[in-house]
């Protein structure tokens, strides 16, 4: 199945944008990949971490288009990204840097969703949220402390949580950093995502609310399965 999509990524009230998003489409192989990474502001070079992980996942995906099932590719892409981050952090001297990640790959009529941290994916169908990733965050320390992520000093914490679903034409998939969903009530976000207006207009409304209420970078990918 193919997708129709739109993306956005803004620094918001922060000085720099440490979020990254990418979309890859391979129409001849009937698959696509969407990735959002949110560099961790509590560590140095969060933007570099997000860029490194996102690029490594996309490069692995492009190099393995014809091989392996989607779940295996997702897991191995995350391993490649973790290795890339480890190597990047040691170019001069060991540097602490990390990023969250959420990705969704669609092959034929199956979507494989993986995430580490508090970046989210929503799968919506017929006015309902069919699936939403659960944040990897420590409830004792609040939502600001993630328990699973890509971290240069500890590659083991980058084990992704993976889920698979059948998708249908008309399904909507939304990937975003926490700067989006923390800017509005959950019911408002999901209502906006299901608006029948053109995707660009739907995203414009979400961006407007983020501009007003988000205190972080905000990034998202909204796609419709066709």
Cite the ranges covered by each PLM segment.
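PP2C/PPM-type serine/threonine phosphatase catalytic domain
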Residues: 1-226
């Amino acid at each position: 199945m193919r997708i129709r999509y739109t993306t956005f990524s803004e620094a918001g009230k922060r000085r720099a944008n440490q979020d990254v998003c990418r979309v890859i489409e391979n129409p001849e192989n009937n698959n696509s990949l969407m990735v959002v990474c949110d560099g961790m502001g509590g560590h140095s070079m969060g933007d570099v971490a997000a860029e490194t992980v996102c690029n490594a996942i996309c490069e692995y995906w492009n190099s393995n288009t014809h091989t392996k099932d989607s779940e295996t590719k997702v897991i191995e892409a995350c391993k490649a990204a973790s290795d890339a981050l480890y190597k990047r952090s040691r170019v001069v001297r060991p540097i602490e840097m990390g990023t969250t990640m959420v990705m969704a790959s669609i092959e034929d009529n199956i979507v494989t969703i993986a995430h580490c941290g508090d970046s989210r994916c929503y799968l919506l169908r017929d006015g309902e949220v069919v699936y939403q990733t659960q944040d990897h965050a420590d409830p004792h320390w609040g939502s600001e402390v993630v328990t699973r992520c890509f971290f240069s000093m500890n590659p083991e914490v980058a084990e992704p949580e993976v889920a698979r679903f059948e998708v249908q034409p008309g399904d909507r998939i939304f990937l975003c950093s926490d700067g989006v969903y923390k800017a509005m009530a959950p019911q408002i976000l999901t209502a906006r995502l299901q608006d029948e207006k053109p995707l660009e207009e739907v995203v414009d409304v979400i961006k407007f609310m983020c501009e007003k209420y988000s205190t972080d970078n905000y990034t998202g990918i909204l796609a419709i399965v066709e």
